[in-house]
Amino acid sequence: MIPDVSQALAWLEKHPQALKGIQRGLERETLRVNADGTLATTGHPEALGSALTHKWITTDFAEALLEFITPVDGDIEHMLTFMRDLHRYTARNMGDERMWPLSMPCYIAEGQDIELAQYGTSNTGRFKTLYREGLKNRYGALMQTISGVHYNFSLPMAFWQAKCGDISGADAKEKISAGYFRVIRNYYRFGWVIPYLFGASPAICSSFLQGKPTSLPFEKTECGMYYLPYATSLRLSDLGYTNKSQSNLGITFNDLYEYVAGLKQAIKTPSEEYAKIGIEKDGKRLQINSNVLQIENELYAPIRPKRVTRSGESPSDALLRGGIEYIEVRSLDINPFSPIGVDEQQVRFLDLFMVWCALADAPEMSSSELACTRVNWNRVILEGRKPGLTLGIGCETAQFPLLQVGKDLFRDLKRVAQTLDSINGGDAYQKVCDELVACFDNPDLTFSARILRSMIDTGIGGTGKAFAEAYRNLLREEPLEILREEDFVAEREASERRQQEMETADTEPFAVWLEKHT
């Protein structure tokens, strides 16, 4: 089932320097909660400055949903320490609140009013809040409080030059973009390994079902927790953050121009369902528009091709201008065993897997095959640890044992690990392979199995509160290592100044501005 990458691996072993200079970055979301686990109703902590313009700490959907962002980094340890500093400073500056350590929220009552993230009075700030108003009216606020970790990854120019020859200009844009689309297609075909190993949301609180019927065969504990005994990541299931109306958009990952055209079409395609919501009611705007996507970011995807945007530029226009610059992996649940929601083992595994995805052949993929890859993902998400579970290839009928496919994949990853260790020194990547391959013979070692044991004992709420309390105490006491207190104070002041400048510069009424920008 795994493509034959022996030739590509032999090529890599002859060109190890092609992997010198991998760049990566992390984003981690987390809900601010009170000591009893309920959602904080306070505004964004003052010490964190402006959520609109702060370089490292912002908010996602809700005012209580923090998002931490590391700068691009070539050093894994430095990146994780930077992320830990962001958590340390925040933990010391959020009063008695703490950070929820799980992807799935708990203690949010049905119909509870969840305050949308607020970004001030500039047109850009108001637009961001309006977009969130649209998300709330389309999908419900509860779904938007699910948190995850995003891992951003780019291969060095040396890799592309070793693989594609001496490239520059338009040629480089085309070939590098084609290379990243290969990564994306392989990710859709084999990325289910991420929730298998690191999925950490095998259960949900009963409030999450909001009284709606479900066809999933949930088991229920006395405290009202619903779980599937072999599930890995309900966050990635249809109960979590997915968008049914997007499933027939037909966006594919074979070609830059085709992909962008599909995306641009989706933001212009009217939706009957969303038209029923209306655009305005009693003078209050309800969504940006009633199209399938309000803006490009609404496209739900487990992985995205990205380029840093310039001021006023849409993500797709940035891709058209310069091609794909990096990949954003979006399938990671919060790691409940780490105070910062992600750890070194995961980052090293993702490095290995992304390199493998760049090496393995990836035939073009139609939108129907893309839909078929979802079958494997759903199996792993809902019953990934089930003994004897099998997976298919695309829309074909042949089935292969997950256990064997996983081991075959790790046989290749071990060779990538040897190459990465040879240029970085030590054996850190090979150790990660040895630790994780054991999860196929013993699924009890996976994150989902480990966290489910705790959840069955103490419930999601009890588990979440215990971890949140322990991490709060730990982070508050740890000294900063990379950033200093004065760096945070300076960024707070600079971010507030930037927001103020934006608000002062805006003279156009929001309605007029909105018309021009949508």
UniProtKB/Swiss-Prot annotation:
The keyword ATP-binding is assigned to this record: yes
EC number assigned by the record: 6.3.2.2
Catalysed transformations (reactions): L-cysteine + L-glutamate + ATP = gamma-L-glutamyl-L-cysteine + ADP + phosphate + H(+)
Record keywords: ATP-binding, Glutathione biosynthesis, Ligase, Nucleotide-binding
GO MF, one annotated term: ATP binding
Pathways per UniProt: Sulfur metabolism; glutathione biosynthesis; glutathione from L-cysteine and L-glutamate: step 1/2
GO terms under biological process: glutathione biosynthetic process
An annotated GO cellular component: cytosol
UniProt similarity note: Belongs to the glutamate--cysteine ligase type 1 family. Type 1 subfamily.
Entry protein name: Glutamate--cysteine ligase
Annotated organism of origin: Shigella sonnei (strain Ss046)
